[in-house]
Amino acid sequence: MNLFSCQPVQPGDAPALQYLYASSPRYFQTIAAPIPLLEDVTRELESALSDPRRQLEFVVVSGERIGYLDLKFDYPQTGDVTVNLLLIAETQQRRGLGALVMRDLERRLSGRVRKILAGVFFENSGAAAFWEGLGYHFAVDARPVLSWYAKELGMQPARETAQLEAAQLETVQLEAAQLETPQLETAR
């Protein structure tokens, strides 16, 4: 069984995050940016971890960090959460893991946030299709650089939220159990 978990990124995790970035060169080609150097990632983490609205998580499968989730709460408005980045290592893509991570995030945030937003850089039809496949709709046109997709979660009473979370968690766990994810070598 290959269940994933999301684990908080710590200040000393810059080398692991930089390794994950380096294992995803197509993403950086798509956004026309070089793969960040370790010193750039170190500064990025220092800045993000000092912002109380940011939440950074590694996506972990079988003890290996194979993805990264960068969130900003109450942005652009109170009650919103923006996915700054959902990155799954290229060797782990096209297996449904990104969708599982987002379903799990939606479950965790259900009843606590109004909506989730995600930006798609440039004309990235694959990313747009990913978000649309998860029920996100085109929300804001900031082209040529960025298009925003959004999904309303809605606030719910605590009792209904707990029941929904239990049902959604069971679904996510069943889907995760069906994944066959080979190991990704990580820098130590």
Which sequence ranges carry the predicted segments?
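Short, charged/polar, Gly/Pro-enriched secondary-structure boundary elements
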Residues: M155-E160
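Glycine-rich phosphate-binding loop
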Residues: G96
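Accessory recognition modules or surfaces
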Residues: A99, Y149-G154
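Conserved active-site alpha-helix within GNAT-family acetyltransferase domains
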Residues: A99, F122-V140
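Acetyl-CoA-dependent GNAT
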Residues: L3-F4, P8-A14, Q18-Q93, M102-D104, ...
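Conserved beta-strand-loop-alpha-helix junction that forms the acyl-donor binding cleft
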Residues: Q93, A118-A128, V145-L146
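Conserved GNAT acetyl-CoA-binding A-motif
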Residues: L109-V120
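Long, intrinsically disordered low-complexity tandem-repeat segments
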Residues: T161-T186
